[in-house]
Amino acid sequence: MQLALTGANGQLGKTIQQQWASAPISERYELHPFDKQLDITDFASLENKLSASGVSVIINAAAYTEVDGAEQDAEARRLAFAVNGDGPANLALWAKSSGARLIHLSTDFVFDGTASSPYREQDATNPLGVYGASKLAGELAVAKILPSDSVIVRASWLYSQYNKNFLKTTLRLMVEKDSLAVVNDQTGSPTSTSALTHFLFNIVCSEKGNGIYHFSDKGVISWYDFAAAIQEEGIKAGLLEKSIPISSISTAQYPTLATRPAYSVLDCTRAEADFACTTAPWREQLRQVIQCIQDRD
C-alpha cells in the first residue's frame, strides 16, 4: 500500500522519514514524501501527483507555521489560510473521491488558553490569532468533507532535532548569549516529533479511529521551565559548556505580534484509550532528542 506524506521537509516530516525504515509500518506501506513539489493549495496539481502514486493513506504535515508572521499583513493572512485551510480541504476532497484515508495535523492554538484543566477534543475552540484560525479552518473542512475516513491530531509545543523550534533556538542562544529571559506564564506540554511519529504510525497501522485526538508528552510546564531543563540536559550531554542566567519574565514583558494561549495543556485520554498507548514524560523525551542532536554533531 502507498502512503503520502506532505510537508516532508518540516521537522515532523523529517522525523517520520528518519524513523520509517526501522518501523513495522515500512513492511506494509511504501512512503511517498512530498514537500513543495506537491502544492496542496492547487487541487489539480495535487490530484495528478497523488493519483499517480496510488495513495491510500495521507499524513498531512504541511503547514504555514509562522505564528507572528501570519499577523503581519493581508498577504500573510491569505497564505496562512491557503495552506492551513484550503490545503487540508483539497486533500480531504481528493481522499473522498479516491477512497483514501487522511490523517491531518493540527495544534493547541485552536484554543484561547482560558481553561483551567486540560483541553478535551470536544471543548469549544476560540483561536486568538490568524495562525490558530487558519488551522481551525483546516480542521473544520476535513471533518465536514471526510467525516468517517479522517483523523485530526492536535499536538502542542512541537520540537525535534530538526529545523527551527524552541529547543534548537534555546540551545543556540545559550551558546551565543550571556543570559536569557523566558516567559513563565504560558503553560503547556512539549511534544517531541519522535513520540508524535510513533503515535501517527500507530493510527495508520491500526486502521481505526476517526475524529479528533489530542497528543503531547506527559507533564505540564512553562516555557521558562522548558528552557531551564534544556540547559541542564544540554550541559549533561556536552552540547553546552556552561550555564547562563535565565530570567523568568511575564508575557507582557515579551510582546509579540500574535497572542499566545496562556494555557495549552491537552487531555490525551482518548488517544491513550483508543490506541492502547501511553504518553512518555516530557523530560525523558527531551533527553532523547538532545541525545539525537549530540549524535548528529
Label the predicted regions.
Residues F199, S206-T256, D297:
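Mid/C-terminal beta-alpha module of Rossmann-like enzyme folds, strongest
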Residues M1-S22:
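N-terminal Rossmann NAD(P)H-binding glycine-rich loop of SDR-like oxidoreductase domains
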Residues L140-G188, T193-N202:
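NAD(P)-dependent short-chain dehydrogenase/reductase
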Residues E75-N90, V110-V153, W157-L158:
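Catalytic helix-loop patch of NAD(P)-dependent Rossmann-fold dehydrogenases
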Residues H32-D42:
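Rossmann-fold cofactor-recognition segment
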Residues I40-V83, K96:
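NAD(P)H-binding glycine-rich loop region in Rossmannoid oxidoreductase-like domains
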Residues A280-D297:
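Amphipathic terminal alpha-helices
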Residues Q11, W223, S247-C268, P281:
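Active-site loop of classical SDR/Rossmann-like NAD(P)-dependent oxidoreductases
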